[in-house]
């Protein structure tokens, strides 16, 4: 069975892992890093992904970051005359992770387990599956990030324990409470905030820098796109620095200019000031944490371990806040950047049978239901219900002789339908005429192991049935997804072709250089006619490079390579002959020296005879 990879598709960074020899292993990217920035850039028709895209973000306005924050919405990115959905941008990131995994494993990868924030709604989960499909991946399972982290943390743990997974990533926050032991993982409750993460901590530092610079220079940097990108990079670096030191220097020379000349930003940021700036953000993580404890029917003292996930949990104020709330020192035995991908790989191992005796019971993060008379939200499945699950309820008509009913499917916790998230609508028609309240309409909700919702409505009188699989609210049809899959494949092919062209040019340039050196080294050791032939072939290759015709470059390169190889062979042969001649000459002269040697007679003198 081919490998199923585990992917943590993050807001800021992504990570891919696989089961090898019974253990989950992170797959490094070609740059040697274990995580890849979730950044995509477009430049002169070329797509850049990861570290290379992040490095040029300051100078390239066509750079997309933190796209995960827009998953499941109708948000679009307009670049070079084309609109991209969040699914398409995410698919470009997934394509890179897929290619890196294939290079590492030496085999084609077609299946994946992808993680999502536990608090993602159905639209966001469906959008993630669509992104996988566009990238050429069959998404076998969607796993909640805190659950994946718990899988990686608890796989070898045999003792029963209750853990709290506190997951503060680049753009989302989740908290889950699980009971685990001896291969059994049960999520008791989950909560979170999909609009809170490390990006927001960067933002408060940026706002502070903008305010301080304006106070000092009277210039508002927030209107300058390039300056703001430099500020974002500096803010992110300062945030990371302050996890290890108590103050850091932010220095951005030539950040802008006015009539008096260039302006530089120089500022010292202390950890205390950063804590003050981000205090509200830290506090916002504690509300969902308390709610999860309450939903699980537990107090802080019932928690055995606190597992921190996500790069933002390295912030000292965050660690201090969770320690204060739970009374526990956070567990430091997992890498917060990698543990989710490792857990996804474990889940992939469960699906392939590589990992045995693991039972995972997850929950739905939000309540599900329909709109009933008066715009009320009637819940059929309460939040934190173990999935997969199915629930039915019978409803009736609101008016006499009503021929159809609209089923408005919603997800959320508010009392009124208008305040919750619409997942979809469908209609059950051809209801026989009857007084209101008489027809029996059974509505059934099914949630699968991915947290994806199916809803059906059935008229119990006629057995007529209508169903809907909720698709993402971004409204991507199957046709649109298939078209995007084809575009993604075409782009991957184009990227491969472009790389091959670049490599061909580099090889041709190198050959021109080495030819010039070889001709110089040959000097008068070969016929002028042969040298002229090589010169002509070299000039032909140079012209082909200038014309930038791939076929001509390849043909001219092959022709020159053949001539240079023959010349080089001749040079080596001459060098070998010269060396042999020198060795023979050395042996001859040694023989002559032997002929001139005279054997001397000697006589032993006895000192006693001299006396």
From Swiss-Prot:
Protein species of origin: Shouchella clausii (strain KSM-K16) (Alkalihalobacillus clausii)
Protein name according to UniProt: Chaperone protein DnaK
Purpose of the protein: Acts as a chaperone.
Residues recorded as bearing Phosphothreonine in the entry: 172
Family, similarity comment: Belongs to the heat shock protein 70 family.
Pfam families, per database record: HSP70
Region (Disordered): 575-611
Keywords: ATP-binding, Chaperone, Nucleotide-binding, Phosphoprotein, Stress response
This protein's record includes keyword Chloroplast: no
């Amino acid at each position: 069975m081919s490998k199923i990879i585990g992917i943590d598709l993050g807001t800021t960074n992504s990570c891919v892992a696989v089961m090898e020899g019974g253990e989950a292993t992170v797959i490094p990217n070609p740059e040697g890093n274990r995580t890849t920035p979730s950044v995509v850039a477009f430049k002169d028709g070329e797509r850049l992904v990861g570290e290379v895209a992040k490095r040029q973000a300051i100078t390239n306005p066509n750079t997309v970051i933190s796209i995960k924050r827009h998953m499941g919405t109708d948000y679009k990115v307009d670049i070079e005359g084309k609109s991209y959905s969040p699914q398409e941008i995410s698919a470009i990131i997934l394509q890179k992770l897929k290619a890196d995994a294939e290079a590492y494993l030496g085999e084609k990868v077609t299946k994946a387990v992808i993680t999502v924030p536990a608090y993602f709604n159905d639209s966001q989960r469906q959008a993630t599956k669509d992104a996988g499909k566009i990238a050429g991946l069959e998404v076998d399972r969607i796993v909640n990030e805190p659950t994946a982290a718990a899988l990686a943390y608890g796989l070898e743990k045999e003792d029963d324990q209750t853990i709290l997974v506190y997951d503060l990533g680049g753009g989302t926050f989740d908290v889950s409470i699980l009971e685990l032991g001896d291969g059994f993982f049960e999520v008791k409750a989950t909560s979170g905030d999909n609009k809170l993460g490390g990006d927001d901590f960067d933002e408060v530092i940026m706002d502070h820098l903008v305010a301080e610079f304006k106070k000092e220079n009277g210039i508002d940097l927030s209107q300058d796109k390039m300056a703001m990108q430099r500020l974002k990079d500096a803010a992110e670096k300062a945030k990371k620095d302050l996890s290890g030191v108590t103050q850091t220097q932010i220095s951005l020379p030539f950040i802008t200019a006015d009539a008096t000349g260039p302006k530089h930003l120089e500022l010292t940021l202390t950890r205390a000031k950063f804590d003050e700036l981000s205090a509200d953000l830290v506090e916002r993580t504690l509300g969902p944490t308390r709610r999860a404890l309450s939903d699980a029917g537990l107090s802080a003292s019932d928690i055995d371990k606190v597992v921190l996930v996500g790069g933002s949990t390295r912030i000292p104020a965050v660690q201090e806040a969770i320690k204060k709330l739970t009374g526990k020192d956070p567990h430091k035995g997992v890498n917060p950047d990698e543990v989710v991908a490792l857990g996804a790989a474990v889940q992939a191992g469960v699906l392939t049978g590589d990992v045995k005796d693991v039972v995972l019971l997850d929950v739905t993060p939000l309540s599900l239901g329909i709109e009933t008379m008066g715009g009320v939200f009637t819940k059929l499945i309460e939040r934190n219900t173990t999935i997969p699950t199915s629930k039915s309820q019978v409803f009736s008509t609101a008016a006499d002789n009503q021929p159809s009913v609209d089923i408005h499917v919603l997800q959320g916790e508010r009392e009124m339908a208008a305040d919750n998230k619409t997942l979809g609508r469908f209609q059950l028609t051809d209801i026989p005429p009857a007084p209101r309240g008489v027809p029996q309409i059974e509505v059934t909700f099914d949630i699968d192991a991915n947290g994806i919702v199916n809803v059906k409505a059935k008229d119990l009188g006629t057995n007529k049935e209508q169903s809907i699989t909720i698709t993402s609210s971004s409204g991507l049809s199957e046709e649109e997804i298939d078209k995007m899959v084809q575009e993604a494949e075409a782009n991957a092919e184009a990227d491969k072709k472009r790389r091959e062209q670049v490599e061909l040019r580099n090889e041709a340039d190198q050959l021109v250089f080495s030819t010039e050196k070889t001709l110089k080294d040959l000097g008068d050791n070969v016929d002028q006619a042969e040298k002229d032939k090589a010169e002509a072939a070299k000039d032909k290759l140079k012209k082909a490079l200038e014309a930038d015709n791939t076929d001509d470059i390849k043909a001219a390169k092959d022709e020159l390579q053949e001539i240079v190889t023959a010349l080089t062979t001749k040079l080596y042969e001459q060098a070998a002959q010269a060396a042999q001649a020198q060795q023979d000459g050395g042996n001859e002269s040694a023989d002559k020296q032997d002929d001139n040697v005279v054997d001397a007679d000697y006589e032993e003198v006895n000192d006693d005879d001299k006396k």
